[in-house]
Structure formats: C-alpha cells, structure tokens
Amino acid sequence: MGRGIAFQLTNILRDLGEDLDSDRCYLPLAEFRAMELTPEMVRAWSEPDRCAEFIRAQCERARAHYDRSAPLDAMIDATCLPTLWAMTEIYKGVLAKIEADPQLAVRGRARLSTLRKVWIALRAKHALAKAENPK
C-alpha cells in the first residue's frame, strides 16, 4: 500500500498547479493551514519560503512511503519486479525534480526526459529477460 501512496502523492505534486487552476486540491487543507498557507497562496507562490517548505514537506512524505515500501520488492514475482522497478524509478525521478525545484509543482509539470525513460525501460527489459530465462 505504501508504494501506491507514494505514487499517488507524486502524481498530486506533479499536477498540483493544474489541479489548483481547476479548483481541485488533493492535499489535506490541514497541512496547508499548519504552515499558514492556503492552496491559493501556494498556487500564486506568494510566500516563496513557506511555499517551498510546504512542497518539500510533501516530497518528504512521499519519499517516506517509498522507503517504507521497499520490502514490497521481495514479495513480487521476479517476472513482475522489472515493471515495478521501472515505475518506481520514473516516479522517484519526477519527485526528485520537484524536490530540487519546489516551485515546479505549480509552475509546470515535472517529467523525465524521453532519454531517461528509455534508459529505465531498457534496464527493466533486460532485467525481465534475465528473470524469464535464469541461468
């Protein structure tokens, strides 16, 4: 369940600006209030230091779910593990971009380059081939 929560939090952060523009907010309002912010203030980035701190705190929460879900990898069938690994690498990569530039959560859409995604896919495909044909 932790990996799913981590993926969902990453999606929420990736789409935050777009969602706020459409009057949707999937983060708890109590977390905004705890930092004396509103979703509108974060969207406008009106308090840059607090907004960045808020986004980083959400990133830390997502990262904690990724970390706590690490034991999941040992429970997954070897032929399914490369897919989970690839998804996790892509989502963690998006999260890392937001962590490095918190305003990206409202300024644009964090994404990995096509080259990075191709590299991840090739590594997953290689791992799948090894899992399907163990020596």
Predicted ranges, named:
Residues 1-7, 13, 17-135:
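Catalytic cores of Mg2+-dependent Asp-rich isoprenoid enzymes
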